[in-house]
């Protein structure tokens, strides 16, 4: 079986979905920009060697419809001989893209893949044109399609208090801002054209979504948004709404050696798993256990963790269930989706890229990226430095 390595991982800055810096920039343009920059950063790669572009996107309609992977690759001027496919595993879409590329490389069905994902939640909101079959309620709880209510239930089941959520939400913003000040985002963020408040064209170099003034005390004043009477989940402890894209260059170790490219990590294990849609945020737990078993590792072997912060209640429930509460100094060291936002199709390769950069910065060997997925799934990837 061929060894799979990641040579590069980049992303756009995260823009606010409401009147943000990318309000006049289309999802295809964000994606195409990263595709071009991956090639600029890796001149030893002949674009003709890319087997396929695999791009995650959840709301595949309007500008994100009709196979955005292909549209963006054509917009980027990539060779027309390269394939392009858009995949949808809801929140895990771009991590699914990584898994599909990895599986192809392992089995000899291609040597080089360009993967990533995008979501412009300002242009195509999450609930745009959602139409669940009412018969679904025969098999799942009525509120399973309301992500915030599933987080409320998960938090109650695992004893995650309002105070714990507020502290975690503030931590996300503080750590993301600290990462900005220390330059820890510099190797993954690619400056991207956007527009300032006046509408003038501007080069966006930093995340727009982080709120450095956020404290647990300020979050404690917010009202619950999903269960106004008995709830604990607020806008401040939910992932922000943002627009962005991410990308990775994935190839076989043999191809990287042939091209003289330096692999940053290899894929050690990967998995998906299902869970009850009513507690969809629990998905990372079975997915992580499955990925670790396939990698021949235990949770004790993981040196750095990236849990996607869909909600503080959700992320903390997974931390508690995996028994790593005593490892908070190894978890989401640059903050997460509460501060940066969760552009659905973008997030899987975004958190993976952040983890890879942190693994290098902290000089550790084994890392885990995992995320929950709407309607009851989880996805996880174990990375090892090479």
Curated annotation (Swiss-Prot):
The catalytic activity of this protein is classed by the Enzyme Commission as: 2.3.1.16
State the protein's name.
3-ketoacyl-CoA thiolase
Which key words tag this protein in UniProt?
Acyltransferase, Cytoplasm, Fatty acid metabolism, Lipid degradation, Lipid metabolism, Transferase
The family assignment reads: Belongs to the thiolase-like superfamily. Thiolase family.
What InterPro entries has UniProt attached to this entry? Answer: FadA, Thiolase, Thiolase-like, Thiolase-like_sf_Thiolase, Thiolase_acyl_enz_int_AS, Thiolase_AS, Thiolase_C, Thiolase_CS
Q: Which gene encodes it?
A: fadA
A Pfam family recorded for this sequence: Thiolase_C
The listed locations are:
Cytoplasm
Q: What does this protein do?
A: Catalyzes the final step of fatty acid oxidation in which acetyl-CoA is released and the CoA ester of a fatty acid two carbons shorter is formed.
The pathway entry for this protein reads as: Lipid metabolism; fatty acid beta-oxidation
State the signal peptide span.
Answer: none
> Which PROSITE patterns does its entry note?
THIOLASE_1, THIOLASE_2, THIOLASE_3
Q: What class of enzyme is it?
A: transferase
**Enzymatic reactions:** an acyl-CoA + acetyl-CoA = a 3-oxoacyl-CoA + CoA
Q: State whether it acts alone or in a complex, and with which partners, per the record.
A: Heterotetramer of two alpha chains (FadB) and two beta chains (FadA).
